[in-house]
Regions:
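Rossmann-fold cofactor-recognition segment
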Residues: 41-51, 68-70
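Alpha-helical substrate-binding/gating segment
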Residues: 160-170, 177-206
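Short amphipathic alpha-helix with an adjacent loop that forms part of the alpha/beta core around
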Residues: 52-60
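N-terminal Rossmann-fold cofactor-binding loop
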Residues: 31-35, 48-49
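Conserved beta-loop-beta element that borders a ligand/cofactor-binding pocket
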Residues: 128-150
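N-terminal Rossmann NAD(P)H-binding glycine-rich loop of SDR-like oxidoreductase domains
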Residues: 4-24
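Glycine-rich "substrate-gating" loop/helix at the edge of Rossmann-like oxidoreductase active sites
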Residues: 144-153, 173-185
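NAD(P)-cofactor binding segment of oxidoreductase domains
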Residues: 59-105, 111, 115, 122-130
Length: 206
């Protein structure tokens, strides 16, 4: 049985990913501070990713799914603490693309500061850069807005609620802004595919 390490595991995306792979029969470990209820079937590694010590030493994972890396330091600290692993998937963000670039964004689209996302986007770029230098065969995914079960942000659900209740809601400015959403289950299915291909990829998922 393959072992998967999921960083986080208690909120929305990381929790969904952990539960998804438990259901698929993987041995799933979650790395978090144990401040929230844990999902059924996961193995908890209780630690702060910024102060990991030796909790991961001597452990081997077939796949590391890094959902909670927001800076280059986050990536460095995890890599320094890990024992060994075969594949590494970083969940980055579409925020790495400048707002001035034409959509749809492509993998070869230039990355850079986005005035709407600010440091969140530039920090994600830093995380990607660190990972590419240290783990050249890593996978980097750049999803747009993620939605689905267990979402802790009242965002797309607000729009759905308004539609279901026949309530008005207002679009920013002239309503021409384009946003793309990607279901968290499709993100998992996408990871299923790339793990079967075993090549180096840097991909946007929306």
């Amino acid at each position: 049985m393959e072992k998967i390490l999921v960083t986080g595991g208690t909120v929305f995306v990381s929790r969904y990913i952990a539960e998804y792979y438990v259901k698929k029969g993987y041995e799933v470990y979650v790395l978090n501070r144990n401040h929230k209820p844990q999902s059924e079937g996961v193995h908890l590694i209780e630690a702060d990713r910024h102060n990991l010590g030796d909790v991961l030493k001597g452990k081997h994972f077939d796949v590391v799914m890094d959902v909670t890396a927001y800076t280059g330091e986050d990536v460095n600290l995890l890599l320094d603490a890990l024992g060994s692993f075969d594949d590494y998937i970083l969940i980055s963000s579409r925020a790495v693309y400048p707002e001035t670039e034409d959509q749809p964004f492509m993998e070869e689209t230039a990355i850079g500061e986005n005035k709407f996302w600010g440091k969140y986007g530039t920090n994600k770029i830093e995380a990607e850069t660190v990972l590419q230098k240290r783990v050249p065969n890593a996978y980097i995914l750049r999803p747009p807005y993620l939605y689905g079960p267990m979402n802790n942000v009242y965002r797309e659900t607000f729009v759905f609620d308004c539609a279901m209740q026949n309530r008005k809601f207002y679009l920013p400015k002239d309503g021409s802004m384009k946003l793309q959403f990607f279901h968290v289950k499709d993100l998992c299915r996408f990871m299923d595919v790339i793990l079967e291909m075993k090549q180096r990829f840097l991909l946007k998922t929306g």
